[in-house]
């Protein structure tokens, strides 16, 4: 069974939910609450070391980064394909996905993490805890 860890308002989560719906796949809703910083908890970081949403869990194998999840779903569930068949149009689709990943996503992700999660998490740590964290994952 597929399980999707996501935020309701996340644009990256929305695009994965749209494809799940269009493919009519059954999935378990694992809604996280951004203000609770679940995505930065130890258990979630084991699923997704980047600490971002969404993360798709399929047979206990985590797939993360929304565009990678879209590709995974297209590759695995081929009954209904949403990729263009024409090679040129497929290249245009990929260019659009890169654009979405680079510009709007980064514009939203950086302030979300800086002010919404990481700043609070790091501010609550002692100097020793912060030093240990940096040694573990520079």
Task: List each model region and its residues.
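GST-like domain detector, emphasizing the conserved glutathione-binding G-site
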Residues: 1-137
């Amino acid at each position: 069974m597929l399980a999707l860890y996501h935020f309701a308002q996340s644009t990256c989560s929305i695009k994965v939910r749209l494809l799940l719906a269009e493919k009519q796949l059954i999935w378990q809703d694992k809604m996280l609450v951004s203000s609770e910083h679940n995505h930065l908890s130890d258990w979630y970081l084991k699923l997704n070391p980047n600490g971002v949403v969404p993360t798709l869990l399929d047979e206990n194998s985590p797939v993360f980064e929304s565009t990678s999840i879209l590709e995974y779903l297209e590759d695995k569930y081929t009954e209904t394909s949403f990729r263009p068949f024409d090679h040129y149009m497929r290249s245009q689709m990929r260019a659009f996905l890169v654009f979405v990943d680079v510009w709007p996503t980064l514009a939203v992700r950086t302030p979300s993490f800086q002010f919404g999660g990481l700043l609070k998490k790091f501010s609550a740590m002692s100097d020793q805890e912060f030093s240990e964290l940096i040694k573990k994952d520079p």
